[in-house]
Regions:
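Core catalytic region of metal-dependent phosphoesterases/phosphodiesterases
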Residues: 2, 11-107
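Residue-level marker for buried hydrophobic side chains located in beta-strands
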Residues: 3-5, 36-38, 113, 194
Length: 247
C-alpha cells in the first residue's frame, strides 16, 4: 500500500507556480497512490461550500480529485485554518472523504495520528482564541448565512488579520508546542504524528520510539510524504536529482 500525504497548498491565491505544481502532481504522482491524504489548507481561503457555484477554479480543483478517485485512489481531505469551512458538498465534488480534525490510521506497524497542526501551536494564545471562535458551530452558521459578496469581504479581512498577527509574532511562538505534541500522542496512544500548518518540514525522532513528520508547504519547500512497504520517505516536488529522505 502506498499512501501520500500533502498539506498547505494554499490554492486559489492566484499563484501560477503553485497551481502548475498541483496540476503536475495530480497528473504524475497522485495516481501512483492507493491513498492520498490532504491535511488542511488545500485552499488559501474557503468560507462555505456555497462558493462552489461561483468559483470555477475551486470546481476545477474538485474535478482533479474526482478524476483521481475514479481511477482508484482513495482521497481524504482534512480542514485547515484557511479552509476550515470545507464541508460535505466540497468533499463530495472531490470524490473524497472529509476527515475529522483528528484521524488515526494504521500504516504497517505504525498507529499514526493525522492533524492539520494548528491546534498544536498552543503558545500562540491569541491565535488559539481566534481559532476557537472561527471553528465554532455559531461561526459556521453565521458564515454560511452570509451572501457570497460579504463572504469575500470577510475572507479579505481575515487574511489581513492573519498577516498582521504573523508579522507581529515571534516564529517560535507560532510553532508546535512540545507538550501539546506529547499530550495529543499520549491521548490517542499513537507512535507517529503527521501534520502540516507550520511550514517547517521536518522529521522529529521522539522518545519511546515515536516520531513526528511535519509536511512542507507548496510555496517554499515543495514536497510530499510517502509511506510504502513499511517506510516513510520525503520526496521533493517537482522531482529533482535529490534522493528522497527516508527512514
Amino acid at each position: 500500500m502506498r499512501a501520500i500525504f500533502i498539506s498547505d497548498l494554499h490554492l486559489g491565491e492566484q499563484d501560477e507556480a503553485t497551481e502548475a505544481r498541483f496540476e503536475a502532481f495530480m497528473r504524475d504522482v497522485a495516481p501512483q497512490a492507493n491513498r492520498l491524504y490532504v491535511l488542511g489548507d488545500l485552499l488559501h481561503v474557503w468560507l462555505g461550500d456555497a462558493l462552489l457555484a461561483r468559483d470555477a477554479y475551486a470546481r476545477s480543483i474538485c474535478a482533479r480529485f474526482a478524476e483521481l478517485a475514479l481511477r482508484g485512489t482513495k482521497v481524504f481531505i482534512a480542514r485547515g485554518n484557511r479552509d476550515f469551512m470545507i464541508a460535505a458538498a466540497f468533499a463530495k465534488a472531490c470524490g473524497a472523504e472529509l476527515l475529522p480534525s483528528e484521524t488515526i490510521v494504521t500504516l504497517g506497524r505504525h498507529r499514526a495520528l493525522l492533524l492539520h497542526g494548528d491546534e498544536l501551536c498552543t503558545d500562540d494564545v491569541a491565535y488559539q482564541r481566534a481559532r476557537r471562535v472561527l471553528r465554532s458551530a455559531a461561526f459556521r452558521v453565521f458564515g454560511n448565512s452570509l451572501p457570497v459578496f460579504l463572504r469575500a469581504a470577510l475572507a479579505r479581512r481575515l487574511r489581513r488579520a492573519s498577516e498582521a498577527h504573523k508579522a507581529g509574532t515571534a516564529l517560535n511562538i507560532m510553532d508546535a508546542n512540545v507538550d501539546a505534541i506529547a499530550k495529543v500522542m499520549a491521548r490517542h496512544g499513537v507512535d507517529c504524528l503527521i501534520h502540516g500548518h507550520t511550514h517547517r518540514p521536518a522529521h522529529h525522532v521522539l522518545s519511546g520510539a515515536r516520531e513526528r513528520w511535519v509536511l512542507s508547504d507548496w510555496q517554499q519547500d515543495y514536497g510530499y510524504l510517502v509511506w510504502e512497504e513499511g517506510h516513510f520517505a520525503v520526496h521533493p516536488w517537482p522531482a529533482s536529482t535529490t534522493q528522497p529522505a527516508s527512514l
